[in-house]
Amino acid sequence: MVSCFDFFLSLNFGKMAKRFVWRTDKPQADLPQTPNSQVRIVSRDLPRGGNY
């Protein structure tokens, strides 16, 4: 019974992880369409590039 419960939990976690990845991937794909987010990406990446 415990193994069935663990299997169910792992299935639920897989679904949640898939949904989370899909949620995070979609906005990133939509980002270049809006100029504001593009500027934000550049400003966010500049310090990282300076550190390297």
UniProtKB/Swiss-Prot annotation:
Induction, as annotated: Up-regulated by the GmPep890 peptide and methyl salicylate. No induction by methyl jasmonate.
Any one biological process term the GO annotation gives: defense response
Keywords noted in UniProt: Plant defense
Entry annotated with the keyword Cytoplasm: no
Residue stretches of biased makeup (Polar residues): 31-40
Region (Disordered): 27-52
Tissue: Expressed in roots. Barely detected in flowers.
Keyword DNA-binding among record annotations: no
Biased composition (Basic and acidic residues): 42-52
Protein name (Swiss-Prot/TrEMBL): Protein PROPEP890
